[in-house]
Amino acid sequence: MDSLADQIRRRRTFAIISHPDAGKTTLTEKLLLYGGAIRLAGAVKGRKAARAATSDWMEIEKQRGISVTTSVMQFEYGGCMVNILDTPGHQDFSEDTYRTLEAADSAVMLIDAAKGVEPQTIKLFQVCRMRGIPIFTFVNKLDREGKDPFALMQEIEDVLGMRTCPMNWPVGMGSTFKGVYDRQKGHVELFDNRDHGQTKARVETTGVDDPALSAVLGEDLHRRLVEEIELLDVAGDPWDFDRFRRGDLSPLFWGSALTNFGVQSFLEYFLKLAPAPAPRLAGDRLVDPEEPRFSAFVFKIQANMNPAHRDRIAFMRIVSGRFERGMDVQHVRLGKKVRLSQPQQFMAQDRQIVEEAYAGDIIGVFDPGIFRIGDTLCTGEPVAFEGIPSFSPEHFARVRFKDAMKSKHFRKGLEELTEEGAIQVFYATQPGHPDPILGAVGELQFEVFQHRMRHEYGVEVILDRLPYEVARWVEGEGYQPRRFWGTDHMAVTDRDGRNVLLFRNEWTMRYVVEQNPGLIFRATAQAR
């Protein structure tokens, strides 16, 4: 049996980040295909027989064809245990993605070859930078016409301030995309796939100097490939593992997730280069993954993964030690012991009971209403990992329900969806305004909230938009909410009773901040 250290060192836990429609869910499906977790990929849009993507499991996701929650998937490949966190690409759900990146040891940045570095990619890249996690880059959709590969490399450096080292190089693009040249192995991988990417691509390998290659590629494409390889060898950044681990250099891969071209070689290089679980700060000390004592933190709560049972699952990232089914752990925030008797691991909504898990793994446990995002669980010496912040919403609305008989269902739905981080809720301090106020990073969150209240809790809700765009958490002894009862701002409290001010715009917010030097205004709130 493998030792604790051996089990932990073979874990690879990563998140995929991208702008919407860069192909993130498709890439996730194809990694699962190559990992043997699924036999037939189903994320091929536009095909009548296409199955719903494995990672897009919520009803609204299937209807809209977008990911709005984080899916957690695990498979074993090449001696490694791989945990994929497939995050929402839509900008309205970036807060869920921020939380998920707290649970990842590395990230795969997916870029559309035709569109280059897009706004949401920039935001998520910056979060990875702040966390100091290594970043892999996968340029996708080479089966379509896109930007020149050298121009894309320059764009990544100019926009993100990060150099790249191509581990492979595309052979053609669009209709002439034939495969990739593996710079480490020195051979060309030619792809053949006749079933729309539903099964693994067939691969033939040959040397770049093979005379037969000209017959396959055509003389012009073959000559251009040789010239580009020579240019890369002279002018490109050499591979440097230390620079990669510091986040200064990103290994760059080219391919097409839709057709599976380049996916397997990317997966194999990823497992070779990606870091095993890293230590995490708890107060004034680092908790090492190989410490024998179990510790974990909750980064996501998902209600109604099985609507028939109205269940709620708390997802936790194991930071150290070994987890065993049925073990008693300390719930640090509540200061009490809890038993984790039904731990589960997931393939999107499909689940199985897990008997044991190790640092780096993601497990889900039944939540009877005692967990919050950011909670720490541990055995032995109590530790408390840093909380996961809430971000300032940019859209606000009062929420009320149509049917007075649904009051209990409304309160339950609002509480559960707030606790899982799907929406933020505030309460006006001014008398006469009893209805809760919802805060969202983007408009689509309101739509998802209404959809889930209707379908999961049986409540029709009405949203009345409010004219505010900025929220700031306020601290300071001199703060008096009634001073801010006006038309340009609103004094509210969040669900933990903390003081918050809502502002019409950035200008109003800056003016109030300048006029109140004795108060502290924060754009984020640390989880309690």
Curated annotation (Swiss-Prot):
Q: Which PROSITE patterns does its entry note?
A: G_TR_1, G_TR_2
What organism does the UniProt record list as the source? Answer: Symbiobacterium thermophilum (strain DSM 24528 / JCM 14929 / IAM 14863 / T)
Q: What is this protein called?
A: Peptide chain release factor 3
Biological process, per Gene Ontology: regulation of translational termination
Upper lineage is: Bacteria, Bacillati, Bacillota, Clostridia, Eubacteriales
> What keywords is this UniProt entry annotated with?
Cytoplasm, GTP-binding, Nucleotide-binding, Protein biosynthesis
Q: Quick check: keyword Protein biosynthesis in the entry? A: yes
Family, according to the entry, reads as follows: Belongs to the TRAFAC class translation factor GTPase superfamily. Classic translation factor GTPase family. PrfC subfamily.
InterPro entries, A to Z: EF-G-like_DII (IPR053905), EFG_III/V (IPR035647), G_TR_CS (IPR031157), P-loop_NTPase (IPR027417), PrfC (IPR004548), RF3_C (IPR032090), RF3_dom_3_sf (IPR038467), RF3_GTP-bd (IPR041732)
* Pfam families (UniProt xref): EF-G_D2 (PF22042), GTP_EFTU (PF00009), RF3_C (PF16658)
What GO molecular functions are on record for this protein? GTP binding; GTPase activity; translation release factor activity, codon nonspecific; translation release factor activity, codon specific
